[in-house]
UniProtKB/Swiss-Prot annotation:
The keyword rRNA-binding applies. PROSITE patterns: KH_TYPE_2, RIBOSOMAL_S3. Residues 39-107 form the KH type-2 domain. GO terms for cellular component: cytosolic small ribosomal subunit. InterPro entries: KH_dom, KH_dom-like_a/b, KH_dom_type_2, KH_sf_prok-type, Ribosomal_S3_C_sf, Ribosomal_uS3_bac-typ, Ribosomal_uS3_C, Ribosomal_uS3_CS. One of its GO terms (biological process) is translation. The lineage of its organism: Bacteria, Pseudomonadati, Pseudomonadota, Gammaproteobacteria, Enterobacterales. Binds the lower part of the 30S subunit head. Binds mRNA in the 70S ribosome, positioning it for translation. It comes from Buchnera aphidicola subsp. Cinara cedri (strain Cc). Keywords: Ribonucleoprotein, Ribosomal protein, RNA-binding, rRNA-binding. This is Small ribosomal subunit protein uS3. One of its GO terms (molecular function) is structural constituent of ribosome.
């Protein structure tokens, strides 16, 4: 039975970067990892209504820089920047080093896999029909310029006794193409019947910058080996 590799982990170092950017020795590695987990858990719990997509953590020599990607930056910043200052102080307490918090706005939340998954799960918790929620999210993503999108929900859909899995796809989602910019994320809907899992794949296009170019030493010209299939037609 075929299994699917994680689309983000497969493309790390090729077209995608890490969410935690730092280097640590063997002694400090576990402490840094635990600290990052606590910071992300606190941010997502504190900003549950701010539509937070991801949290990037960078550790410099003696301080930490946290970048929060959100579709509602006004909720994160607060009145005259009071909320973001409280957030910075709390993160500094968790990590034990001076913290810097940056806010990055997501212009098109319809093309962010995490926000799409959270939107569908919130609709399922409000007892919206799952097919209607999926089709609405697919139409919004394609309207905003997505090349393809796939959404999968699994669990006791519609309150039935036997759990099942359903998915809907529009456009193309090339999972094996490394240069394909595919966003993948998940979410959970806590309903009265149980937990319903939501998975979202969004294909935004291909990234060709930074790809490996093979060069011929004799000709000193870069080339890409492509097999041309010649077809002969008989009259």
């Amino acid at each position: 039975m075929g299994q699917k590799v994680h689309p983000n982990g497969m493309r790390l170092g090729i077209i995608k970067s890490w969410n935690s950017i730092w280097f640590a020795s063997k002694k400090e590695f576990s402490n840094y990892l635990d600290s990052d987990f606590k910071v992300r858990s606190y941010v997502k719990k504190k900003l549950i209504k701010a539509s937070v997509s991801k949290v990037i953590i960078e550790r410099l020599s003696k301080n930490i820089r946290v970048t929060i990607y959100t579709a509602r930056p006004g909720i994160v910043i607060g009145k005259k920047g009071e909320d973001v200052e409280k957030l910075r102080i709390e993160i500094a307490k968790i990590t034990g080093v001076p913290a810097q918090v940056n806010i990055s706005e997501i212009r098109k939340p319809e093309l962010d896999a995490k926000l799409v998954a959270d939107n569908i799960s919130s609709q399922l918790e409000r007892r919206v029909m799952f097919r209607r929620a999926i089709k609405r999210s697919v139409q919004n993503a394609m309207r905003q310029g997505a090349k393809g999108i796939k959404i999968e929900v699994s669990g006791r859909l519609g309150g039935v006794e036997i759990a099942r899995r359903e998915w809907y796809r529009e456009g193309r989602v090339p999972l094996h193409t490394l240069r394909a910019n595919i966003e993948y994320n998940t979410s959970e809907a806590h309903t009265t019947y149980g937990i319903i899992g939501v998975k979202v794949w969004i294909f935004k296009g291909e990234i060709l910058d930074g790809m490996l170019v093979v060069s011929n030493k004799k000709d000193k010209k870069p080339f890409i080996s492509v097999k041309k299939v010649s077809q002969k037609y008989r009259k």
